[in-house]
Amino acid sequence: MTQDLTETLTERGMRYGAFVGHAEVTQHLKAYYRHELAKRGKNMDPDQFEAMDMIMHKIGRIVNGDPDYADSWVDIAGYAKLVADRLDGVVR
């Protein structure tokens, strides 16, 4: 198991960059959007916050790692689609 985990972490590092860099970028993005919402007196539903957090996570991977990895972009679209569908009455 340790070998499998090491291989997985190495592969992810090659794709997304060092985890500490990703964490730094992602936490800045999350703090920024939450600050801007609060500054404007806005709130969101839990699914919207979660989707935004996951989108920021994916953007962090793009910024810190490989911007040409299509799956990251598809994931962003997927999280946005889940919220848009729910707003249109389709809960997934």
Listing of model-derived features with the role each one plays in the protein:
Residues M1-R92:
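Intrinsically disordered, low-complexity regulatory regions
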